[in-house]
Curated annotation (Swiss-Prot):
Family: Belongs to the WhiA family.
Any Gene Ontology biological process: cell division
Protein name: Probable cell division protein WhiA
InterPro entries per the UniProt record, alphabetical: Homing_endonucl, Sporu_reg_WhiA_N_dom, Sporulation_regulator_WhiA, Sporulation_regulator_WhiA_C, WhiA_LAGLIDADG_dom
Ranges annotated as spanning the membrane: none
């Protein structure tokens, strides 16, 4: 079964972009999924992913943006799930492309944060976040017990930059150190849907919201049922206690010990055990009595039963 995160990423790889946005997205993809190697005195870049659609996206962006020779390799993992691993290999103009994408400086030292030149425009900010999500992002299926979206970064500076970029859209993202790197994450459902909208995953957003609405409605119904059940149990418990106290009084000293108004209620409760307090109030001979009035008289009967259990003498008033 395809995961919600995989479906979201597949949708993102089909989006059309402006040229400036292509550069921002590609920079995030290469920075986060790329690795460098030297062979025969030549620098090459391998961009690795387990998602075929993302591999095609990287391949297309490199060919379109730089008109270079790009190799696409497929390998199978031998451990765990044994998924295919797709490697997009760039074997020419590697240094120039890394510099153009603001991943390395002229002296070939790495730039750990996000260059402002890449994200001057709002559309480019969105595209960089899209590339970062494609490269290192994950999002829980909204049907699971908790909402969670995160983007993993190897370096703290870059992770902090992603967090700052996300919070420029008022997403209230937070950072956390993991064993092998850092993450920027969202826990609020509303913020996750906002993020999906920002990066252009509109179909995923609609699916997320549909599932969330159904889930929240189901939870509301469950809470209502639980509340009603608790109230019903409380009502049943009170009725059983009242009947037991009335029987105790009757068997110990007789119901005649009770004042007339209390005795009538005691007899009604004993004879009509399944009726509600409202229905009891409608049965009283002297005229209708409210639920609170019936409850007050039943509490007095409870008090008399407790006094009898404690060995006190109860006289008819």
């Amino acid at each position: 079964m395809v995961s919600f995160a995989s479906e979201t990423k597949k949708e993102l790889t089909n989006l059309e972009m402006k040229e400036c946005c292509e550069k921002a997205e590609l920079s995030a993809l290469l920075r986060m999924n790329g690795s460098l190697s030297f062979s025969n005195r030549r620098l090459s870049i391998d961009i690795q992913t387990e998602n075929a659609a993302i591999a095609r996206r990287i391949y297309t962006l490199l060919k379109k943006g730089y008109d270079v020779t790009v190799e696409l390799l497929v390998r199978k993992k031998m451990r765990l799930k044994k998924n295919n691993v797709y490697i997009v290999r760039l074997v020419e103009k590697s240094r120039e492309i890394l510099a153009d994408l603001h991943i390395v400086r002229d002296d070939f030292s790495f730039i750990r944060n996000i260059s402002q030149e890449l994200i001057e425009k709002k559309c480019c900010k969105r595209s960089y976040l899209r590339g970062a999500f494609l490269a290192g992002g994950s999002v829980n299926n909204p049907e699971t017990s908790s909402y969670h979206l995160e983007i993993f970064s190897l370096y703290k500076e870059h992770n902090d930059a992603i967090c700052e970029l996300m919070n420029g859209f008022d997403l209230n993202s937070k950072t956390l150190e993991r064993r092998k790197g850092y993450i920027t994450y969202l826990k609020e459902a509303e913020k996750i849907t906002e993020f999906l909208n920002i990066i252009g995953a509109h179909n995923a957003l609609l699916r997320f919201e549909d599932i969330r609405i159904v889930r929240d409605m189901r939870n509301s119904v469950n809470r209502l049922v639980n509340c009603e059940t608790a109230n019903l149990n409380k009502t049943i418990g009170a009725a059983l206690r009242q009947i037991e106290n009335i029987r105790y009084i009757d068997e110990t000293v007789g119901l005649d010990i009770l004042p007339d108004k209390l005795r009538e209620i005691a007899q009604l409760r004993r004879d009509y055990q399944d009726v509600t307090l409202k229905e009891l109030g409608e049965m009283v001979s002297g005229g209708k009595i409210s639920k609170s009035g019936i409850n007050h008289r039943l509490r007095k009967i409870d008090d008399i039963a407790e006094k009898l259990r404690a060995g006190e003498t109860v006289a008819k008033k």
